[in-house]
């Protein structure tokens, strides 16, 4: 995406495969000299999965109103030592009331944006790539778990107004980049069958139909953590996957409170293994 830009959407399968080969070969040459047989096998597996993953991302971008605008975006007020000109967003800073400051720093895998001039807003979606199985559970966020993606999202909403005028949280999604293979009944298979691999996405989205529909324009449920009625097109499972602006604000404020509590405990010498 970074190298091909908008042209990435129109690459043929053969061109995608060639791009993967070039990128993997480049990485191996720079980082993995003298590979073992086992490592060579694992690299081959990575190549195959990347071809499928990029195909999925192509399908997503072809139908989505959102566009990737940043990759590995640093949230930090200090320049990167290796690349001082790299784009970055200032972190949120919270005061604990005792003279200490909490700074939220990190790196966002991908940021997608959809400007809506009529509303004077730029809606932002954070995409967090994960391997294996990863399920977003909002109830765990309230206990201080699985907070990273939302912390990044709320940081962008508060501190990325210069880069993205009217920055507004549209949601965050985990993209399972190396999911477990799906079980398929052999009776459903044919010699010609070669279904495109799917990569589950789950997370929390803004409860605004025009926004989540822009992420999945045909209502397939393939690109958002939602199920749509085949008859009405309405969302069926919205309780834990959609939140209106007021609810997102409450979640943001709750996370701020958790971070301040953590800081107070650390400075007081209370470092229990919680929550576990």
What is the predicted role of each segment?
Residues 1-276:
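Structural signature of nuclease core domains in nucleic-acid processing machines
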């Amino acid at each position: 995406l970074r190298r091909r830009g908008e042209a990435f959407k129109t690459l043929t399968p053969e061109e995608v495969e060639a791009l993967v080969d070039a990128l993997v070969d480049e990485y191996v040459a720079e980082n993995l000299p003298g590979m073992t047989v086992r490592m060579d096998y694992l690299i081959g597996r990575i190549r195959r999965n990347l071809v499928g993953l990029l195909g999925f991302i192509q399908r997503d971008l072809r139908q989505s109103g959102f566009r990737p605008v940043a990759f590995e975006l640093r949230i930090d007020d200090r320049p990167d030592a290796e690349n001082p000109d790299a784009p970055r967003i200032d972190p949120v800073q919270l005061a604990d009331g005792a003279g200490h400051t909490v700074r939220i720093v990190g790196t966002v895998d991908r940021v997608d944006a959809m400007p809506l001039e009529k509303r004077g807003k730029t809606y932002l979606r954070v995409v967090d790539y994960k391997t294996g199985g990863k399920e977003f559970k909002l109830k765990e966020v309230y206990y201080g778990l699985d907070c990273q993606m939302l912390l990044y999202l709320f940081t962008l909403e508060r501190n990325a107004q210069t880069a993205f005028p009217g920055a507004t949280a549209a949601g965050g999604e985990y993209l399972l980049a190396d999911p477990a293979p799906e079980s398929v009944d052999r009776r459903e298979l044919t010699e010609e069958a070669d279904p495109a691999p799917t990569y589950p996405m789950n997370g929390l989205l803004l409860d605004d139909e025009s926004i989540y529909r822009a992420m999945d324009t045909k209502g397939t449920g393939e690109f958002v953590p939602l199920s749509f009625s085949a008859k009405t097109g309405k969302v069926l499972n919205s309780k834990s996957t959609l939140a209106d602006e007021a609810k997102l604000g409450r979640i943001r404020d709750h996370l701020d409170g958790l971070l301040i509590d953590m800081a107070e405990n650390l400075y007081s010498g209370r470092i229990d293994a919680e929550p576990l």
